[in-house]
């Protein structure tokens, strides 16, 4: 209304990425609930409303698979060192985002313990999950769910780590759509200084 008073006409309003994603125990609003909550304020303006549903569509379309390399129980905390790290999925370190982490092949004969799932980058922020109750053994494969939104695009080569491969699953078929980066591929554009 203030913009209209200033002679700045609007044709639409973009409310951004409003729809949330269920990571833990949240209940994000449905599209209808979201629209109904905004309708009283926006309807009288007569504007088209645009929304960017990106994360609500893509987050649960992707999972990061990681292997348990080493179990390191201590008197204070139990650490599961995994082969994924903060360079593969930065959201937990950057935003303290809670990611649902599940065993791909759950073990029913292994004791459930509380674990911190940490990478091998040796940074205090290198974790994908803290205080997770899981029955773990070395070489177990874990799925970090909800990693489809911004997972790969925010990944990096920190500590000269190649980014993970990407696999697209369509029905019962899996297709490699991006190969895992290798040390050689990371170095291929680097050059040494000429010898004198």
What are the residue ranges of the model-derived segments?
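Solvent-exposed, well-ordered amphipathic alpha-helical segments
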Residues: 1-4, 10-15, 114
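Alpha-helix-loop-beta-strand connector modules within alpha/beta enzyme cores
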Residues: 2-6, 34-46
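Flexible, glycine/charged-enriched surface loops at secondary-structure junctions
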Residues: 6-12, 48-53
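Glycine-rich beta-strand-to-loop/alpha-helix junction loops that act as flexible
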Residues: 13-22, 53-55
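Short, solvent-exposed loop/turn segments at secondary-structure boundaries
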Residues: 24-29
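Charged (often Lys/Glu-rich) extended helix/loop segments that serve as interaction or gating elements
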Residues: 37, 46-196
């Amino acid at each position: 209304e203030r913009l209209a008073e200033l002679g700045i006409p609007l044709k639409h309003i973009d409310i951004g990425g409003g729809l949330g994603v269920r990571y833990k125990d949240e209940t994000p609003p449905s599209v209808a609930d979201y629209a109904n909550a905004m309708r009283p304020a926006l309807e009288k303006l007569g504007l088209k409303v645009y929304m960017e549903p990106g994360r609500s569509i893509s987050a649960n379309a992707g999972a990061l698979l990681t292997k348990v390399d080493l179990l390191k129980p201590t008197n204070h905390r139990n650490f599961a060192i995994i082969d994924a790290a903060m360079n593969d999925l930065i959201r937990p370190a950057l935003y303290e985002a809670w990611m649902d982490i599940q065993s791909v092949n759950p073990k029913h004969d292994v004791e459930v313990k509380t674990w911190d799932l940490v990478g091998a980058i040796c940074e205090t922020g290198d974790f994908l999950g803290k205080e997770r109750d899981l029955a773990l053994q070395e070489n177990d494969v874990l799925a970090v769910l909800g990693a489809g939104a911004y997972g790969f695009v925010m990944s990096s080569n920190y500590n000269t780590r190649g980014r993970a491969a990407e696999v697209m699953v369509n029905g019962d078929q899996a297709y490699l759509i991006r190969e895992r980066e290798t040390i050689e591929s990371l170095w291929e554009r680097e050059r040494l200084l000429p010898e004198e």
